[in-house]
Amino acid sequence: MKKLLIALLVSTFSFSAMADGHAEWWKKAGAPYAGTVLQGVAENTPPGQFAGEVLAKDFEALTGIKVQLENTSWDSMYDKAIKDMEANSGIYDFVYIEQDIVYDYLNRDFLVNISEGLANNPDLQAPGVSLDDFTTFIDYFKDGSGDVFGVPMEAFIKVYLYRKDLFEAADAKASFRAQYGYGLAPATSFEQYRDNAEFFTHYCADNGMECWGTTVQGHTGHPASTYEFLESIGPSFGLYNWGVNMDSYQSCVENGGQLNGGRAKAALNFWTQLLPFAPPEALQSTWSEVGASFAAGRAAQGWVYGENAAWIATDAEKSAVVGNVGVMLPPTAPGVMTQAASGNGYIGYFDGGAYGIPHSSKNKEATMLWLQYVAQNEVQADWAIAGGRITHKSTYADPKVMAVDEQADGYFTLMRDTGFLYAGAPPFPFHGAGRGAIDPFIYSALAGEMTPEAALDGACAALDQVMADLGYQN
């Protein structure tokens, strides 16, 4: 169905993109580079598929420049991009830059300054395209001078999804109240979330349904689980910036950090204790499998990335829960929402990424045209519908997006109105090395090989060692 949806969008999209009044400019600008093949690598997500299967084809029809976008797994994408840039081999003309890794890339001077490149090449500046049209998410891809090094192609929040049909079932309501002493409802606290998870696991089993009480992004061999803890579960308990003291770059409590503090340990205990109420695939689930599990009706509730929320709620050929998806902010600990609203914390991760140009690219000018093409306001609405992402301010008011928003229980409205409560990853140039040091401890806690307390004591010590070795600690 995903390919069918994209095919249907192609038939309507191409005409609208070419009718923006600037088709002749694109043809003229692309003429010197006609026949050029741009190689790109990105993660295989719904937004990435739309870019490769729709936008790239329309761009080629206008300019004669072919875009070959290799959408692959997160692991492979990261590995291929960074090896290419480290070796300066020039295999890729553009790469996907995840928000959380951009500081590492900037620190290592991997990327072309797009603002500077366009300023120095006025003939390449597309009419009607302005970097000012983006939401504030573009700020994550700027350096200290405000220059842009990546053009955002996806941005979304991680929301709480729940099954309306299960939560509204009369027998479920009666049984829950009898068992727990209060009314069944989507969770606004962790205690309620845990009760819901326990209840629906038994309710589904008693009614012969293949469903459980919650999703868990708990892969024991993939960084997705570490990210889930550091960027979703932890912040909702009040653990920010990985528990790192941003003045001293220490993460252990005894040195002024918080990674093994009370909030962190409460968060990891809560999360690992959900595993008995999660589908069997939980310990092999990344963000993709979580989306698939929820869409298959295998969970009553869960933290789910927005790139999946829209199709889960609207794509009847791919999702078994269309018409029954509720969307809310995730539960938070007392005080967290206040801290987030005042800018002193955040409730979860504002995820997304951008396309950037490596210094090693052999086709920088042609790639500048491609990145501006995907930055047009005119292409954003269909892209948002296909991938649950919004990078431009005007997209929220597009009639097509508003129609899908209604079907998706107000997901886009929620992102627009509460996105300020979320935040991107902390600005750590050592992001990859630091997260890698934490990974084995999160895996061990999920696998039951270490207690959450011991795992976080080990994780903070390992992270502190990385920061010390790299010279960050005072």
Regions flagged by a language model, labelled:
Residues V54-D133, D147, A169-A170, S175, ...:
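Extracytoplasmic "Venus flytrap"/periplasmic binding protein-like
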Residues Q192-T201, P235-Q284, G326:
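Glycine-centered hinge/linker elements that transmit conformational signals in sensory
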Residues A23-W26, A34-V37, E43, V325-G335, ...:
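Long, aromatic- and glycine/proline-rich binding clefts that accommodate carbohydrate-like moieties
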Residues T72-K80, T188-Q192, A282-A296:
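Short helix-initiation/N-cap motifs at beta->coil->alpha
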Residues D20-P32, Q99-V159, F229, G326-P331, ...:
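Hinge/lid segment of periplasmic solute-binding proteins
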Residues A23-A29, P46-K66, L161, D165, ...:
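Short, polar/charged alpha-helical segment
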Residues G146, L166, Q273-P279, E317-I390, ...:
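Extracytoplasmic/periplasmic substrate-recognition and gating elements
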Residues M1-L38, A61, D464-N474:
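Short, low-complexity disordered leader/linker segments with a strong preference
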